[in-house]
Amino acid sequence: MNASFRYGRDLEVVQRLRPEPLTEREQAAQASVDDLDFEIFRHKMDMVALEGKETTMKLGASTAMRWGDVAFGIYTAQGDLAVCATGIYHHAVLSQIPVKYIVKHWRNEPSVGLHAGDAFFYNDPFYGGVHNADMGLSIPVFADGELVCFIGAAVHTGECGGSEPGGTVCGAKSRYDEGLLVPPIKIG
């Protein structure tokens, strides 16, 4: 059974938009970098995020993606947004919530866990999205066997199987009318 369905919605995670406390490793890294080196590193991270966003737009199958209704972000190992490039900012901010959910429920879960090569998909607004037409993918990144960050993209797709065309069902009478609603699940 997939852990998302076993754990269900986690309202505590949904409310954790503030940054998590710094880890000892983050504090040591912060103390060892001067302002100039930090700005150079920050600029490099900004460029990585911008290239991720532009690549996502070029690969887009939906018109909204090609027009820039996308976000690409790099998140800390705790799920906090570190840097992003976006056409619609709320995608990047809200993508913290599924990442924090993944960290809380799966990082040490023996049957799922987090491993190099994993990928997690989600689009359910109850797990941090805006609406089900906004679909996200987050991938944990490891260095020397240690989780160091997540990278992720959130995109707006036009169709997601709702009872009305266009991805947003204004006349929905139940959540099933809205189409595909997927909690954070491991797909790779």
Q: Which sequence ranges carry the predicted segments?
A:
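Long, charge-dense accessory insertions within large macromolecular proteins
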Residues: 2-101
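Mobile "lid/hinge" segments at catalytic clefts and subdomain interfaces of large enzymes
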Residues: 147-188
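General beta-strand structural signal in soluble alpha/beta enzymes
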Residues: 74, 83-85, 112-115, 121-123, ...
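Short, Lys/Arg- and Gly-enriched loop/turn segments at beta-strand edges
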Residues: 128-134, 159-161
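A charged amphipathic helix-loop-strand protein-protein interaction module that recurs
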Residues: 90-125
